[in-house]
Amino acid sequence: MASTAGGAFGFASGLIIQEFGYDDDVDETLRQAAEAETGTTLVDEDYEDVADSAIVWWRDDDGDVDDLTDLLVDAQANLDGAGLIWVLTPKARTTGAVPAAEVEEAAATAGMHATSAASMGQHWSGIRVSSRGR
């Protein structure tokens, strides 16, 4: 698994990033890194316009693989074109951890695929998900 020092998502400047699953346990440093990369403020899940990419914070107690599939479908529907989605989960062997296989299964069921994985900060892992055509 690659490491992203400081949370480099690979977002381009000016992109609108929609955030799903925000709670008090998210890594503010990662959020700030995404905002620094784009030069824009993250928009929440109630944002009513199209976004370029998305960040999904997902924990074990947020639901099962079907719930994650539904959320990925919703996130993809809000994207302009085939934007990327980062699914961030607590690291393995920590409270709320989600097996990477669950994220991969949810992505496949949603018609997407996991393209890479990375260590995202001290407490989170990230799986980059994109549409199959990408």
Regions found by a protein language model. Name each.
Residues 1-134:
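S-adenosyl-L-methionine-dependent methyltransferase catalytic core, i.e., the SAM/SAH-binding region
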